[in-house]
Amino acid sequence: MQSNNKLKKNQDFRMVYQKGRSMANKLLIIYIVNNNLEYNRIGFTVSKKVGNSVVRSRVKRLMKESYRLNEGKIKTSHDIVFIARPNCKESTYKEIESALLHLIRKMKLIS
């Protein structure tokens, strides 16, 4: 994932939360909004409720890797934010990947 494909500014995250559609499952929440660009911009959020910094970083790395490996299947021109729920801290990579793909399918983002 290139650095220009990441959501970084608080203003960008707020816009996705306010104007985007959302869906959730046991492990993750997804927010999505069209961005009129030729690529997706992605943001990952893990709250302090999930655990200490080591746990939060692990969960964020697992989410990023799950997205990276499936990036080619996902339609472009969207801003997407993934939020980890507290159940994520005990989850394996496969569980997080299947939860992420489940949400992407539900939002009809698979090309």
UniProtKB/Swiss-Prot annotation:
Answer whether the UniProt record assigns the keyword Aminoacyl-tRNA synthetase to this protein: no
Keyword field: Endonuclease, Hydrolase, Nuclease, RNA-binding, tRNA processing
Catalyzes what? Endonucleolytic cleavage of RNA, removing 5'-extranucleotides from tRNA precursor
Identify the domain of life.
Answer: Bacteria
Molecular function terms, GO-annotated = 3'-tRNA processing endoribonuclease activity; ribonuclease P activity; tRNA binding
Function description: RNaseP catalyzes the removal of the 5'-leader sequence from pre-tRNA to produce the mature 5'-terminus. It can also cleave other RNA substrates such as 4.5S RNA. The protein component plays an auxiliary but essential role in vivo by binding to the 5'-leader sequence and broadening the substrate specificity of the ribozyme.
Q: What is the protein name given in its UniProt record?
A: Ribonuclease P protein component
Supply the source organism for this entry: Alkaliphilus metalliredigens (strain QYMF)
